[in-house]
């Protein structure tokens, strides 16, 4: 049997799959970085979510580590290059939470154009701002997707159902059967769109993929939505673009600094035309079960082959 430690929680159904497989001796419970390094001895499979940072020194401490399972999409919390050098396999679940993130994206978009958060907070403060909260329809508008993987495709399905024109930039996608116009470069797509929605992982290629240069290219009054990773969007440039009214409004589920309590993020969140959620894109009951089960099945498959 292999020793498996779940440093972050998985859905009960996923844990049962791992237990019933008969190939793992399982422990669970969150260790911080220093505790994790001390307790990795003998652990061959390590399961994490976004709360655990698997850095090079953590990996080096895991002398028996064979497999890292990242239950979720992003691998920015795992030093994949260091793992590769040490011969440690790394797996994630890229499509499992796509529906959850796509639904939140559409919710953020509609909340933004119809002023739902402001309407709610106003009513709670006994304000009746009916005349002030004139919004816009998304029907007939053009949405530009940066990233057209599993999540981007799910967003496209929903945007098309709302009657939007959908454009997408993804250098790794050359064709699609969907009614989506693919672009080979951002510079050509951005001037065409009324709103931009980011759906890319955070890596060296995508760090600040939207910054001042890109904001200069979008239509005046464009909308920005980020439910991907905070680092893919230059938040200082976003703040400046909103202040200059180049960007009309933004909806953010993720931040380069989380929790977003530093000066820049507080200024950004203090703007009336910025709405935000605390990185809850994948936080649905169904999404968590799907992520956990997919991760469990993958680890069982790998364990049987080792």
Predicted regions and their residues:
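An N-terminal-biased, well-structured beta-alpha scaffold segment characteristic
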Residues: 1-91, 188-191, 211-213, 217
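Rossmann-like dinucleotide/phosphate-binding beta-alpha-beta segment
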Residues: 131-220
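Short, Asp-centered acidic motifs that coordinate Mg2+ and/or phosphate
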Residues: 44-45, 67, 195, 223, ...
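Phosphate-binding beta-alpha-beta segment of Rossmann-like dinucleotide-binding domains, i.e.
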Residues: 86-88, 94-142, 150, 154-157, ...
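Structural/interface elements that position substrates and couple domains in central-metabolism enzymes
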Residues: 2-5, 13, 22-27, 95-100, ...
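Residue-level detector of alpha-helix initiation sites
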Residues: 53, 74-77, 96-97, 142, ...
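Short glycine-/small-residue-rich Rossmann-like dinucleotide-binding loops
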Residues: 30, 51, 73, 194, ...
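Rossmann-like dinucleotide-binding domain for NAD(H)/NADP(H)
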Residues: 90, 212, 221-306
